[in-house]
């Protein structure tokens, strides 16, 4: 059973790439044609890559791998949080802070600080502080929740990063590669497929395209962790 159909991808606008002048030649094998100055992605290739990605992610989840979803641009932010939470994964959807992976010890301390402030807020301890001090603590809490809220349950660096928009998330890519963390990446026509282990060529700007891909990857994680055999991604060859 196919993970996604051509009709679903067409409806989501997954085939629209960038203007031809903005392309990366390494993506040529995933491009069907150019139309009105815009590259059109070969959705047959995308379907194959989605099947491969589904099986790869499902297998990784089954073996206990931990996932981090990353996508900080406006179109991706809400979907990234929604799908990561649905499959019990961590996420970054506002801003990638330098050292989130490569300086994990410091980042973990900031996450612990966030948890402490949340406990203080829920217990009423902040409300009992002098007004000015309480306001400072609440501002700190809001800032930490915004940038680190999706990492509260991440006890160590992830095994896999699921990425939306490789070009925008350059720092996340560099940190993951430095630590040999596997990358599952949505790749638009301006991206470099050599920088990830699991490529998914598709439109990484359209909300519906992002939703389609991430929802299937979340399904794969849930299936790998909790069992169930719906046959997605399987080709009948075991």
UniProtKB/Swiss-Prot annotation:
Protein family membership: Belongs to the universal ribosomal protein uS2 family.
Domain of life: Bacteria
Record-linked HAMAP family: Ribosomal_uS2_B
This protein's GO CC annotations: cytosolic small ribosomal subunit
Protein name in UniProt: Small ribosomal subunit protein uS2
Source lineage: Bacteria, Bacillati, Cyanobacteriota, Cyanophyceae, Synechococcales
Keyword Ribosomal protein set for record: yes
GO MF term set: structural constituent of ribosome
One Pfam family per UniProt: Ribosomal_S2
GO biological process terms on file: translation
Keywords associated with the record: Ribonucleoprotein, Ribosomal protein
């Amino acid at each position: 059973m196919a993970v996604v159909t051509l009709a679903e991808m067409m409806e989501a606008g997954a085939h629209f790439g960038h203007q031809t002048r903005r392309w990366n030649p390494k993506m040529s094998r995933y491009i069907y044609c150019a139309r009105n100055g815009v590259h059109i992605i070969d959705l047959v290739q995308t379907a194959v890559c989605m099947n491969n990605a589904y099986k790869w992610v499902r297998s990784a989840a089954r073996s206990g791998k931990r996932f981090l979803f990353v996508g900080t641009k406006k179109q991706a932010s809400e979907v990234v949080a929604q799908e990561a939470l649905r499959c019990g994964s961590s996420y970054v959807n506002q801003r990638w802070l330098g050292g989130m992976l490569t300086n994990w010890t410091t980042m973990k301390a900031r996450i612990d600080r966030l948890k402490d402030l949340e406990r203080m807020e829920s217990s009423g301890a902040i409300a009992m502080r002098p007004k000015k001090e309480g306001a400072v603590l609440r501002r700190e809490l809001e800032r930490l929740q915004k940038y680190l809220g999706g990492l509260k349950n991440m006890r160590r660096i992830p095994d896999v990063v699921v990425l939306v928009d490789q070009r925008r998330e350059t720092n996340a890519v560099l940190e993951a590669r430095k630590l040999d963390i596997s990358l599952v990446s949505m790749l638009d026509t301006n991206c470099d497929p050599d920088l990830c282990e699991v490529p998914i060529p598709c439109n990484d700007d359209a909300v519906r395209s992002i939703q389609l891909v991430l929802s299937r990857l979340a399904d794969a994680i849930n299936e790998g962790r909790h069992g169930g055999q719906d046959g997605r991604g399987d080709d009948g060859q075991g």
